[in-house]
Amino acid sequence: MRVGITLPQVGEQATRANVIELAKTADKEGIDSLWVLDRLLWPLKPQTPYRGTHDGTLPVSAQRVFDPIDLLTFAAANTEKIKLGTSVIDMLFHNPVILAK
């Protein structure tokens, strides 16, 4: 079985130190892959409440999202053999030459 994990990319846990620690630990412990996502938009007037808060509003900290390509580049610079991937990416918002690398 292969195991992959998501890098801390959104909210309060998305810090430089957390990304480095998780990427290095995953690489050292034999995790197969690290994953990121692409999030461009946030709902202004959601039709359903967010279940992660008492009042149903999306926390401001959750609106901070690291760019997926930048985050993968950062993870690659801090690991040796782990595979990297995107679970979701909006190709129209990224340079095709950069994505092809």
Regions found by a protein language model. Name each.
Residues 41, 90-91:
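Positions that flank functional sites
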Residues 79-87:
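Conserved catalytic cysteine-centered active-site region
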